[in-house]
């Protein structure tokens, strides 16, 4: 039977500054624990994780073993992240768990990872950390690394600063993701004779490609990211130790490491989650069911058809979107594997000094400053015409969406952090925000399509809520990554509940207007 290594395997370091600190003493033996527990069914035991008192995110801030000929140094990635970050949308499960195509591999699932995280948190509430072990050996290792010139300077980042950086990245990348989604929709749905007539498909595909690349990539945020380069004279002495490192465990360690970096959280949760939109996907399913999809974005009236054709249209939108999104996720992961050598050869990884000392501080101004700029552009739009207010399009097309986008992204971020770990086999946080965003989009759509109701400004605000808040509150990139990481039965249950629940909400919300008064013309969209 294939066994799955724990996501804590491969960590061999600590966060404390002292070589004799408890964290350093416990973390240095985790790789040996992996070899001892390798034959277990899920690679997890009381002595393997909870016995050491270590959390995957806490370990990721320690020393990271490199599957190469050079020794790992003490990583200075001392972001003080909350334990809830273990349940973020950015999963610990890589889309491609066997990149080398080995004949026998050990697979892990999302249920196992989140069960371990949940059990750790419960264990920490019941008992304190165990006493340190082998302090003499830990001190010797620390001194040997110090003499070898591989101990990096540590820079402690407080929890308040870490959360501030994370929120700022989320705000900034939610704005970029919203602009990318709206721009790609305009590019792919405006030309004649388009083979795909529903606008949500291409942003969802493109966002999943980026998500797959970020999840699989190990070069942008390298395993030794933020560490000083070791002394090359000591490389030969470290060959034997490097051979003992399990590449699968090291890969899982790197996945957990990335989730502690605010920039990575901003890219995966902020940009990819805002680039894709689950609520727009469900809206297009309902429009296909109600025979309004062909007329969406055009003045041509739909041709009447029977219910059987509407059911076929519903299946077409559903299957096409899910298939392309999953394909995009794996295509992005394959792209990351393919260009890994190129990144290594030309040293194209993100420089740690620039990110930690400059970009982390600059993003606070950029994030909140750009959000404020979107508010000001909504108050004074660039295309304002005093004599012809009906020609103002910027607010309905983009600026109001940018105002509401960070609110949806931050809501999704905290919902996933607090809810995703409650049911390991069913990501509750992602499900809740997808259902909530779908319902809100349905209400905004109804209010915008009620005949003879409201004016241009009210229409623009509702359009901004639909494109900005609902578009960033719901996500397809995270959803398909969870489908790929869950066990087969749980994936079908979770996927079916998400699509079925979202469509049921749209039938109730949008159907109540569609099958009574009918959809009217939108006043603020040309």
UniProtKB/Swiss-Prot annotation:
InterPro entries in the record: FluC
Catalysed transformations (reactions): fluoride(in) = fluoride(out)
Main location as per UniProt: membrane
Biased segments, Basic and acidic residues type: 21-36, 103-123
Cytoplasmic side: 1-159, 216-260, 332-361, 420-424, 474-492
Chain spans, region Disordered: 1-73, 90-149, 223-242
Gene Ontology CC: plasma membrane
Cystines in this chain: none
Free-text disruption phenotype from the record: Highly sensible to fluoride. Growth is inhibited at a 200-fold lower fluoride concentration than in the wild-type.
Pfam families in the cross-refs: CRCB
Keywords: Cell membrane, Membrane, Transmembrane, Transmembrane helix
Cell compartments where the protein resides: Cell membrane
Membrane association type: Multi-pass membrane protein
Segments passing through the bilayer: 160-180, 195-215, 261-281, 311-331, 362-382, 399-419, 425-445, 453-473, 493-513
Keyword presence, Cell membrane: yes
Residue intervals on the Extracellular side: 181-194, 282-310, 383-398, 446-452, 514-526
Superkingdom field: Eukaryota
Molecular function (Gene Ontology), one example: fluoride transmembrane transporter activity
Stated family: Belongs to the fluoride channel Fluc/FEX (TC 1.A.43) family.
Role, per record: Fluoride channel required for the rapid expulsion of cytoplasmic fluoride.
Name of the protein described by the UniProt record: Fluoride export protein 1
Organism of origin: Neurospora crassa (strain ATCC 24698 / 74-OR23-1A / CBS 708.71 / DSM 1257 / FGSC 987)
């Amino acid at each position: 039977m294939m066994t799955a290594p724990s996501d804590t395997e491969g960590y061999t370091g600590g966060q404390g500054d002292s070589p004799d600190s408890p964290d350093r003493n416990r973390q240095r033996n985790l790789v040996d624990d992996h070899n001892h527990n390798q034959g277990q069914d899920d690679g997890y035991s009381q002595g393997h994780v909870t016995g050491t008192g270590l959390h995957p995110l806490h370990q990721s801030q320690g020393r990271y073993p490199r599957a190469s000929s050079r020794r790992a140094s003490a990583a200075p990635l001392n972001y003080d992240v909350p334990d809830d970050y273990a349940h973020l949308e950015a999963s610990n499960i890589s889309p491609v768990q066997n990149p080398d195509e080995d004949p026998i591999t050990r697979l892990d699932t999302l249920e196992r990872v989140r069960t371990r995280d949940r059990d750790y948190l419960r264990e920490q509430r019941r008992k304190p950390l165990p006493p340190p072990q082998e302090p003499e050996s830990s001190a010797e290792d620390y001194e040997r690394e110090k003499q070898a010139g591989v101990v990096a300077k540590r820079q402690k980042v407080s929890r308040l600063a870490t959360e501030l950086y994370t929120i700022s990245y989320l705000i900034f990348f939610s704005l970029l993701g919203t602009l990318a989604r709206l721009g790609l929709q305009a590019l792919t749905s405006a030309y004649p004779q388009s083979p795909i007539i529903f606008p949500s498909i291409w942003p969802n595909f493109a966002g999943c490609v980026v998500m797959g690349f970020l999840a699989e990539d190990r070069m942008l945020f390298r395993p030794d990211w933020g560490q000083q380069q070791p002394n090359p004279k000591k490389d030969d002495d470290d060959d034997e130790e490097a051979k003992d490192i399990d590449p699968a465990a090291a890969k899982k360690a790197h996945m957990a490491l990335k989730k502690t970096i605010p920039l990575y959280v901003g890219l995966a949760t902020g940009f990819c989650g805002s680039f894709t939109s689950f609520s727009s996907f469900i809206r297009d399913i309902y429009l296909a069911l109600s025979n309004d999809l062909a007329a969406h974005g055009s003045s041509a009236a739909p041709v009447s058809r029977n219910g059987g054709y509407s059911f076929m249209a519903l299946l077409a939108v559903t299957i096409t979107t899910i298939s392309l999104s999953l394909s995009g996720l794996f295509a992005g992961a394959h792209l990351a594997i393919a260009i890994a050598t190129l990144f290594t050869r030309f040293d194209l990884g993100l420089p740690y000094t620039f990110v930690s000392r400059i970009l982390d501080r600059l993003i606070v101004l950029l994030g909140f400053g750009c959000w404020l700029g979107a508010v000001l552009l909504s108050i004074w739009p660039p295309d304002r015409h005093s004599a012809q207010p009906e020609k103002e399009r910027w607010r309905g097309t983009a600026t109001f969406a940018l105002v509401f986008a960070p609110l949806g992204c931050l809501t999704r971020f905290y919902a996933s952090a607090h809810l995703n770990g409650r049911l390991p086999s069913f990501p509750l946080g992602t499900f809740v925000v997808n259902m909530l965003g779908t319902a809100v989009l349905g209400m905004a759509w109804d209010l915008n399509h009620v005949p003879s109701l409201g004016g241009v400004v009210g229409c623009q605000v509702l359009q901004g809520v639909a494109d900005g808040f609902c578009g960033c509150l719901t996500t397809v990139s995270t959803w398909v990554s969870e489908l790929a990481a869950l066990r087969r039965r749980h994936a079908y249950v979770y996927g079916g509940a998400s699509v079925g629940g979202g469509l049921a909400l749209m039938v109730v919300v949008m159907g109540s207007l569609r099958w009574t008064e009918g959809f009217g013309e939108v006043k603020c969209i040309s």
